[in-house]
A protein has these predicted regions:
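Cytochrome P450 I-helix active-site segment
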Residues: 18, 39, 77-80, 84, ...
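Short, small-residue alpha-helix embedded
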Residues: 192-205, 355
Length: 415
């Protein structure tokens, strides 16, 4: 699957990230206008970002139009099925814990009722339709059509790589194996990015000086439609994204299951409850190994006494201890590391940068409720909720004000 997530492929998809970010910007502008014409209004940014990133993974991943940003009456069946299956109000069960250790179960919720079963059946059917359509196109034409992201959607790229003539038959993925990737792409490719961007807007709301500094840098780009290279050329935007993903990793922990006995060396000796000093850990086959992503990302021994503070400037000179963290990106464990690191980290990073580029240039953000009202619920992905109204589910209301109104106000006062 690696060819579908390389830098060249993500460069092709950047237009989708930017176009959907602009669509979200315009939707927020329209939403603010409906709030009695006030200069600023409240928006649940988590809900909107979740819909935007679902649209992106549908279009960039499968050439499928979720239309999640559109009005409810335009919602399609796959959007409804996805919302049903991945509801944040799912109950815990034994399968919940088994998913932590078995990747094949991780993104497949337990079917508790007829509605969930019907939703899963819809996802399977539409997934097969997408799969068969892409396969037929490749088999009959021998090449990808220039429509639909110029043939660069992830499913088409995955099938193209899988059907390459130089791939031995025993290394090819079966249709069932390819189909099984679709729920994983949908969940991992949309929940994590929307949550990460939500925490970014939260951090910027709490730190207006950082928000202003970022907006000043973003304003140096003269177009509303930046390329991937232009997004990656902005050092403070990169620092903000790094700091958000360090302090607020969407997935706070993970687990691995050992398939054979192994030895884990320790960088610092550990003394157990019996007083025995260990310089390494012997791990038996079948042992779950807990990976404390959030704890490592906030460890004062690595990041200093201000490790809990949101300070993008720390990335101008990262601490020496961070260089030893074996993450696939950014000297942190947010995207894990090694051969089972997050395969879509480039996808997520560029999408997040496109969102912040578009939204921070267009709006000013402030907390919509006192900071102490905002709690964190963690079930695979950590999301915000309001302590005063937990029954309402995950949300993050922010005060949102068009930035242009601030400029016009200053010009008016000057004259």
């Amino acid at each position: 699957m690696n060819p579908a997530f390389g830098a060249a492929q993500i460069r092709e998809l950047t237009d989708v990230f930017v176009e959907k970010s602009i669509e979200l910007r315009d939707a927020w502008d329209a939403e603010l206008r409906t709030q009695q014409g006030e200069a600023e209004g409240k928006i649940d940014v988590l809900s909107w970002l979740s819909r935007m990133t679902l649209d992106v993974i549908g279009q960039a991943g499968f050439n499928y139009q979720f239309n999640a940003l559109a009005n409810g009456e335009e919602e399609n069946e796959l959007n409804r099925a996805f919302s049903t299956i991945f509801s944040s109000n799912m109950e815990f069960s034994i399968i919940t814990f088994l998913r932590l250790g078995f990747p094949s179960l991780r993104w497949v919720p337990e079917m508790k009722d007829d509605g969930s079963k019907q939703a899963r059946a819809t996802m399977d059917r539409v997934g097969r339709e997408l799969l068969e359509g892409s396969k037929k196109n490749l088999q009959t034409s021998g090449k990808v059509e220039k429509s639909a992201l110029k043939g660069r959607d992830i499913l088409t790229l995955l099938l193209r790589a899988n059907m390459a003539t130089d791939v031995p038959e025993h290394q090819r993925m079966s249709d069932e194996e390819v189909l099984a990737q679709i729920p994983t792409f949908l969940a991992a490719g949309h929940e994590t990015t929307s949550t990460g961007t939500t925490w970014a807007l939260y951090a910027l709301s709490e730190n207006p000086q950082v928000q202003k500094k970022l907006r000043d840098e973003l304003s140096t780009i003269s177009t509303d439609n930046p390329t991937m290279d232009e997004l990656n050329s902005l050092p403070y935007l990169d620092a903000v994204v790094r700091e958000v993903l360090r302090l607020y990793p969407p997935v706070p922990f993970s687990e691995r299951l050992t398939v054979k006995e192994d030895v884990i060396p320790l960088s610092v000796p550990v003394t157990d409850r019996n007083g025995k000093v260990h310089e390494y850990l012997e791990v038996p086959k079948g042992q779950f190994v807990f990976m404390p992503i959030l704890s490592v990302n906030r460890d004062k021994n690595i990041w200093g006494e201000d490790s809990l503070k949101f300070r993008p400037e720390r990335w101008e000179s990262p601490p020496e201890g961070a260089s030893a963290i074996p993450g696939v990106w950014g000297n942190m464990l947010t995207f894990i590391g090694g051969p089972r690191a997050c395969i879509g980290y480039r996808f997520s990073l560029v999408e997040m940068k496109a969102l912040l580029f578009t939204l921070v240039r267009a709006f000013e953000f402030e907390l919509g409720v006192p900071a102490e009202e905002i709690g964190v619920s963690s079930w695979i992905v950590q999301r915000p909720f309001l302590r005063s109204n937990p029954e309402a589910g995950n949300q993050l209301p922010l005060k949102v004000k068009p930035f242009t109104s601030c400029i016009l106000k200053l010009l008016y006062e000057y004259h």
